[in-house]
Amino acid sequence: DKQALLIDIILFTDLRKSGISDDINDTINYSTVCKEIIMLLQKEFATIECIAETLAQQIKQKFNILRIKIKVRKPKALLKKGAQYAAVEIER
């Protein structure tokens, strides 16, 4: 069964060119990044650790990202235990 996930991603890259030019073509297309994430999440995963690692590797490589920080939260995983969510956070 598919479960809801909350994913926070921070991309670290050189934004000087777009900061100076104010040209959207000189920066990361965040819409394209989101589409890539949605596509990657169509695969079945057993763990949120594997989700985080897969997203980190693929996004970093495809979009020429220097560093990436990803937090994957599973909101309903531990409700019966009184926790808001289970989570994993990685930085690559």
Predicted feature descriptions by range:
Residues 1-92:
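N-terminal, polar/charged subdomain of small-to-medium soluble alpha/beta proteins
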